[in-house]
UniProtKB/Swiss-Prot annotation:
ADP binds at residues 23, 49-54, 196. Gene3D superfamilies: 1.20.58.1510, 2.40.128.430, P-loop containing nucleotide triphosphate hydrolases (3.40.50.300). Pfam families: AAA_lid_8, ATPase_RavA_C, bpMoxR, LARA_dom. ATPase activity is stimulated by ViaA. Keywords: ATP-binding, Chaperone, Cytoplasm, Hydrolase, Nucleotide-binding. Coiled coil: none annotated. It is found in: Cytoplasm. This is Regulatory ATPase RavA. Its EC number is 3.6.1.-. It comes from the Bacteria. It comes from Shigella flexneri. It catalyses: ATP + H2O = ADP + phosphate + H(+).
Length: 498
């Protein structure tokens, strides 16, 4: 692929030109452009008067000397109105059944068919052949048709289990459009003086026939990496498990992959990237219910698996668990260990402080911080005499939290290993240790594992940063992926500070 970044820049500028004067239709224009550049079909769903036909007309200007055909279907539409009238001369002179196709669908590069579901069987059958094989049977001859983009539109979906489903399945990209929502865009639309039929694309940006044919071959050379295929397979398996998921044919999956290849190609990449999979949200849905379901499943895939977010969190959880185990082992070694007294005839077990503890005020460190009396506590100061009395006779024990303020009542106990343990209101405990005996910093094993995990996170974030320069992916999706990666990074950094 020659000069991939220049091609990506050119396609971006081409799309910007096509979008001029159209408000809140950038995503639709970009996907229709992608479909046109890869020879696919688009279905636009939405109420009348929202620029569905204008979108199709604009796409004609993406190509040099492209011809367009536009038709509004009715229940009374005939094949002659779409594919051309019969040649009376050929029928009369030579007895040949032949259509005059000039100016009709068989000779158009860009085709727009409005109210598509009102077409009759005679039109539908011929249209299916045109979409599938890019061929048109004209009498005794089979003619190749130049159609690069078919845009079909309607304000309703086809009825389930109808003869229209075969045609609907050929519409790879499906877009649900609505009227202009933003106030500023609505005002701009009302006051715009631009002629909608003017060509907004400079000649230098228009695609030539030679370029189009060459790109079709180069799109097929874009590779599908193993890790991207695994993501697609995960999505397919997940959809198969959901009872309300739409049926997705093998044909649709295969055509969708070519669309992903085209997205990568026109983004300047030589391989499909996880970010391209977001396009599947506009390819796999069938109706309103499945539209939401597909978007949810792809969102989970993108924010949880595509850049190993969930895998990194799982690794982080294992590292944290190992750190806790090491902390517990260290606590057993460094905790303040009391001396058990005989007390054979005593109803309560008695203890005393180790002989090397002689200070009148003892500052004991919590092996892990606890929230006590609405305060994050890391150490507690005890009067030696009060602690000795509690060890001997029990009752109430008080200490200064973090060594400040008045002494507060504490839930203190001696565990089976003769260590002092303080508990919070939820009964979470923390073993107490003398200053200097608590391990400082992260163990080397944990530190190394966290550094390796952070390095992997940086690699994944760098990959996403490189891949997100994709014209065909909405910014809000990229924002959610960035947030998911930043959340993983924040959790790793937090673990490094423990």
């Amino acid at each position: 692929m020659a000069h991939p970044h220049l091609l990506a820049e050119r396609i971006s500028r081409l799309s910007s030109s096509l979008e001029k004067g159209l408000y809140e239709r950038s995503h639709a224009i970009r996907l229709c452009l992608l479909a046109a550049l890869s020879g696919e079909s688009v279905f636009l769903l939405g109420p009348p008067g929202i620029a569905k036909s204008l979108i199709a007309r604009r796409l004609k200007f993406a190509f040099q000397n492209a011809r367009a055909f536009e038709y509004l279907m009715t229940r009374f539409s005939t094949p002659e109105e779409v594919f051309g009238p019969l040649s009376i001369q050929a029928l009369k002179d030579e007895g040949r059944y032949e259509r005059l196709t000039s100016g009709y669908l068989p000779e158009a590069e860009i085709v727009f068919l409005d109210e598509i579901w009102k077409a009759g069987p005679a039109i539908l059958n011929t249209l299916l052949t045109a979409i599938n094989e890019r061929q048109f049977r004209n009498g005794a001859h089979v003619e190749k048709i130049p159609m690069r983009l078919l845009v079909a539109a309607s304000n309703e979906l086809p009825e389930a289990d109808s003869s229209l489903e075969a045609l609907y399945d050929r519409m790879l990209i499906r877009l649900w459009l609505d009227k202009v929502q933003d106030k500023a865009n609505f005002r701009s639309m009302l006051t715009s003086q631009q002629d909608e039929n003017d060509n907004p694309v400079p000649d230098a940006l228009q695609v030539t026939d030679e370029e189009y044919e060459r790109w079709q071959k180069e799109i097929g050379e874009i590779t599908l990496p193993d890790h991207v295929f695994e993501l697609i397979f995960i999505l397919r398996q997940q959809l198969d498990k959901l009872p309300d998921a739409p049926y997705v044919s093998d044909r649709r999956w295969k055509k969708a992959i070519r669309l992903l290849q085209a997205s990568a190609f026109f983004s300047g990449r030589s391989a499909v990237a996880p970010v391209d999979l977001i396009l599947l949200k506009d390819c796999l849905w069938y109706d309103a219910q499945s539209l939401n379901l597909i978007q949810q499943q792809i969102d989970v895939l993108m924010t949880g698996h595509a850049w190993q977010q969930q895998g990194m969190l799982t690794r982080l959880g294992a590292i944290v668990q190992r750190h806790l185990q090491l902390q517990q082992q260290q606590s057993d070694k460094t905790a303040l260990t009391l001396i058990r007294l005989g007390g054979i005839f005593s109803r309560r077990q008695q203890y005393q402080l180790p002989v090397n503890v002689t200070a009148s005020t003892l500052t004991l460190l919590l092996q892990k911080p606890l929230k006590l009396h609405d305060m994050e506590v890391v150490h507690i100061s005890f009067e030696r005499s009060a602690l000795e009395q509690w060890l001997s006779k029990g009752g109430e024990i008080r200490g200064k939290l973090n060594g400040i303020g008045f002494a507060q009542k504490l839930n203190l106990e001696v565990d089976s290993t003769q260590h002092l343990v303080v508990r919070d209101v939820s009964l979470q405990g923390s073993t107490l240790a003398l200053p200097g005996s608590s391990a400082e910093g992260l163990p080397g094993e944990i530190k190394q594992q966290l550094e390796e995990l952070e390095s992997d996170w940086r690699k994944q974030h760098a990959l996403f940063s490189e891949q997100q320069k994709c014209l065909f992916i909405p910014g809000d999706w990229l924002g959610r992926i960035e947030d998911s990666l930043q959340d993983v990074g924040a959790q790793i950094r937090q673990a490094q500070q423990c």
